[in-house]
From Swiss-Prot:
Disulfide bonds: none
Organism of this sequence: Rhodopseudomonas palustris (strain TIE-1)
Family: Belongs to the bacterial ribosomal protein bL36 family.
Name recorded for this polypeptide: Large ribosomal subunit protein bL36
GO cellular component: ribonucleoprotein complex; ribosome
Length: 41
C-alpha cells in the first residue's frame, strides 16, 4: 500500500478506483487492480 499526501491524482489513474473513509483515514481501493491501493498520510 502506498502512502500519499494527495489521493486525487491516484484516483484518476483507473476507472474502478474508489475513495473510502475508514477510521478517520482516506483510502483508495480497487477490487480488480489491487496495485492501486493507497492511504492518505
Amino acid at each position: 500500500m502506498k502512502v500519499r499526501n494527495s489521493l486525487k491524482s491516484l484516483l484518476t489513474r483507473h476507472r474502478e478506483n474508489r475513495l473510502v473513509r475508514r477510521k478517520g483515514r482516506l483510502y483508495v481501493i480497487n477490487k480488480t487492480q489491487r496495485r492501486f491501493k493507497a492511504r492518505q498520510g
